[in-house]
């Protein structure tokens, strides 16, 4: 359950990453709407 809480917390940063994705192409993210908590960050 703790991991799920972390994913939910990262969802807020995910929105910011989407706005800065054009400025930071090195940061790629993927969100799976099926679960809503599956986030994959690649730095």
UniProtKB/Swiss-Prot annotation:
GO annotation, cellular component aspect: extracellular region
Pfam hit, one: BAGE
Domain of life of the native organism: Eukaryota
Tissue: Not expressed in normal tissues, except in testis. Expressed with significant proportion in melanomas, but also in tumors of various histological origins, such as bladder carcinomas, head and neck squamous cell carcinomas, lung and breast carcinomas. Not expressed in renal, colorectal and prostatic carcinomas, leukemias and lymphomas. More frequently expressed in metastatic melanomas than in primary melanomas.
Subcellular location: Secreted
Keywords for the protein's UniProt record, in alphabetical order: Secreted, Signal
Residues of the signal peptide: 1-17
Note from the entry: The ancestral BAGE gene was generated by juxtacentromeric reshuffling of the KMT2C/MLL3 gene. The BAGE family was expanded by juxtacentromeric movement and/or acrocentric exchanges. BAGE family is composed of expressed genes that map to the juxtacentromeric regions of chromosomes 13 and 21 and of unexpressed gene fragments that scattered in the juxtacentromeric regions of several chromosomes, including chromosomes 9, 13, 18 and 21.
Family membership noted in the UniProt record: Belongs to the BAGE family.
Name the record gives this protein: B melanoma antigen 1
Species assigned in the record: Homo sapiens (Human)
């Amino acid at each position: 359950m703790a991991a799920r809480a972390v994913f939910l917390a990262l969802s807020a940063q995910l929105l910011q990453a989407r706005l800065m994705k054009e400025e930071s192409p090195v940061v790629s993210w993927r969100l799976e709407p099926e679960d809503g908590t599956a986030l994959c960050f690649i730095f």
